[in-house]
Amino acid sequence: MAQEVIKIRGGQALKGEVEISGAKNSAVAIIPATLLAQGQVKLEGLPQISDVETLVSLLEDLNIEARLNGKQLEVDTTQIENAPLPNNKVESLRASYYMMGAMLGRFKKCVIGLPGGCPLGPRPIDQHIKGFKALGAEIDESSNTSMKLVAKELRGAHIFLDMVSVGATINIMLAAVHAKGQTVIDNAAKEPEVVDVANFLMSMGADIRGAGTTSIKINGVEELKGSEYQIIPDRIEAGSYMCMAAAMGEEVILHNIVPKHVEALTVKLQELGVDIEIEDEKIIIRKQTPYKNVDIKTLVYPGFATDLQQPITPLLFMTEGPSFVTDTIYPARFKHVEELQCMGANIKSDEGTAVIKPSTLNGAEVYASDLRAGACLITAGLIAEGVTTIFNVKHIYRGYTNIVEHLKALGADIWTETV
């Protein structure tokens, strides 16, 4: 069966400007959250990625009028109907689990297929389930393919998350906005995307305090009205381009960026020796090799993002000594290691840590096992001698808007082919 691949002839310097898209991890929660509104919602600054299109079509399955036009989405929930969503759309996208919290909040009932997304090892939704049960939902998990959630009424509760989880924090917020009384989420995730979703819900009339801290309080309200809302810039897309620019950038200017959101990466790149200029809403990066070796450990926000662990790895082949990368969030997130070895990289991983030594990369045929592994392989392809062919590019398109066109505009020798 024919499939699209991305090809890169490495060694070309990057120069120019890139506009960073809206945050994927905000958009995939805010789009389901629109179904909580009574009336019309307008979202601006959406990333133009396949995950957004999938979620919009899930809204349409609930008889919601949804018009997606580039970065803008208009939603009208006037004719909304509760319908089961156990279908292949849900399986293709992990963030479809936000439909659970939103539908539970709106209808007190939902039937939904089990979510999919990137295969990153264990990513259970047990904390989501724990939160829904605390709010009064009964959950039927007897089916292998779908889950049924029903609540006679939703009541505020004190919920302590056993592990910090962005998904669970947001999903419980969605379910709790209409619950009677006050809900408290302790050990809540502090990520900018959590704050963004809370700000969106508040723009519709929700009563939420403490988003961005470890304790979030939600006082249930009867009704949420429509609103207009602009999504924050994508810190992971920004970080991925920062890594590509540090690898091959003569001078790359990134616009629509919140420097505070990428602080952990910026500090690590400066440790490496990258030349970085930071302004209000833009960052300028110039390559400055050879780089110093560094150690990286992923942590929850504001620590180093697990989503940037893979994109930064190719830079560590350009250093003077060995570097160590440890992923404490998803210890199984090292499927890119084998692909980099195919390119001649001196890299090994074991039990959540990769050891990376200076290496010369050569073009090869490689497979993107997940979204951020795809960004890693693109960066590796930009550095490598010869042509790199990346298969399984659907993962890359799930999270990066027009990445091939952006890199081409910066001067990369990159193109797509059908094979």
Swiss-Prot record:
UniProt-annotated binding residues for UDP-N-acetyl-alpha-D-glucosamine: 94, 123-127, 307, 329
Places the protein is found: Cytoplasm
Catalytic activity, as annotated: phosphoenolpyruvate + UDP-N-acetyl-alpha-D-glucosamine = UDP-N-acetyl-3-O-(1-carboxyvinyl)-alpha-D-glucosamine + phosphate
Active site: 118 (proton donor)
Highest rank taxon of the organism: Bacteria
Binding annotation for phosphoenolpyruvate: 24-25
Molecular function GO terms recorded: UDP-N-acetylglucosamine 1-carboxyvinyltransferase activity
GO cellular component, one term: cytoplasm
SUPFAM superfamilies: EPT/RTPC-like (SSF55205)
Enzyme class: transferase
Cited CDD domains: UdpNAET
Coiled-coil ranges from the UniProt annotation: none
Keywords: Cell cycle, Cell division, Cell shape, Cell wall biogenesis/degradation, Cytoplasm, Peptidoglycan synthesis, Pyruvate, Transferase
Modified residues (2-(S-cysteinyl)pyruvic acid O-phosphothioketal): 118
Family: Belongs to the EPSP synthase family. MurA subfamily.
UniProt protein name: UDP-N-acetylglucosamine 1-carboxyvinyltransferase 2
Organism: Staphylococcus epidermidis (strain ATCC 12228 / FDA PCI 1200)
Gene this protein is translated from: murA2
